[in-house]
């Protein structure tokens, strides 16, 4: 009996506890990411943004949560009720599930699997199903058009993201996310004998792929200027037209969880994860998770500034950028990186 508990029960209980702790921390982080998104947008437009609920509006997201929870959900008469309610649940569940393999620090990961990057890529590819289900089940033209746009957009830019990941894997030689971070301990800064660890990270050696990944992440998460699936001026609110109350909140939660996931993935692949930017004792003393959160927050700030400054693309421009620019460019970079690694013997 003791062997049974030590082999199955306690490890399962510990994993459940870790998952709940990560879930609570992630939901709190998403609440303040949403607030930061609104504050940054307001600052660019010379407005104050949310500033009533709590000091500096810090509790605005929790007030919105209460508002959504206590509103009555209205289901359209012609909608498929089961799929209509299941769609936001699928969206938010998949967006949160991918965080199981994200290492926030050395050994701070729920499931340190050897194919972690493949798991994240697969989960992010499945998120489009929640949007398609919601658009189809609404039995309305605007949601259906938004869902079709989303499916085409996500499929188009997943190809480029896949090639970017292949390029990083060629340099690292592992699918494990922890190994990808640890591989960024050695690079240009180390070769030059400088303590500038940020020169070792992949953002410098793979700069074109860093730009492609960042822009493709915007398209993958339906962020402006690629928010065609929910374009307010064209499709009212896209696939979320018929949603309100808690289902709408779950779609929003899934969207921002996916955005935070892409910020974390950018941090891991290109910005050194939890590694400090300069290798000195004072910065090495700072916990790695602090560096991880700061870097992910910086990436999200870039997401928010793009939303504030860049106008929305037309649909044909979006498709042209994905298939005629990013796809051949990322494919060429894969070939170039593989050739350089083979030529120099770094592989």
Curated annotation (Swiss-Prot):
It is found in: Cell inner membrane. Disulfide bonds: none annotated. The chain crosses the membrane at residues 14-34, 50-70, 83-103, 115-135, 161-181, 198-218, 258-278, 286-306, 321-341. GO terms for cellular component: plasma membrane. Keywords: Cell inner membrane, Cell membrane, Membrane, NAD, Quinone, Translocase, Transmembrane, Transmembrane helix, Ubiquinone. Coiled coil: none annotated. Its EC number is 7.1.1.-. It is a multi-pass membrane protein. It comes from the Bacteria. It is an enzyme of class 7 (translocase). One of its GO terms (molecular function) is quinone binding. GO terms for biological process: aerobic respiration. It catalyses: a quinone + NADH + 5 H(+)(in) = a quinol + NAD(+) + 4 H(+)(out). NDH-1 is composed of 14 different subunits. Subunits NuoA, H, J, K, L, M, N constitute the membrane sector of the complex. Belongs to the complex I subunit 1 family. NDH-1 shuttles electrons from NADH, via FMN and iron-sulfur (Fe-S) centers, to quinones in the respiratory chain. The immediate electron acceptor for the enzyme in this species is believed to be ubiquinone. Couples the redox reaction to proton translocation (for every two electrons transferred, four hydrogen ions are translocated across the cytoplasmic membrane), and thus conserves the redox energy in a proton gradient. This subunit may bind ubiquinone. This is NADH-quinone oxidoreductase subunit H 1. The lineage of its organism: Bacteria, Pseudomonadati, Pseudomonadota, Alphaproteobacteria, Hyphomicrobiales. The gene is nuoH1.
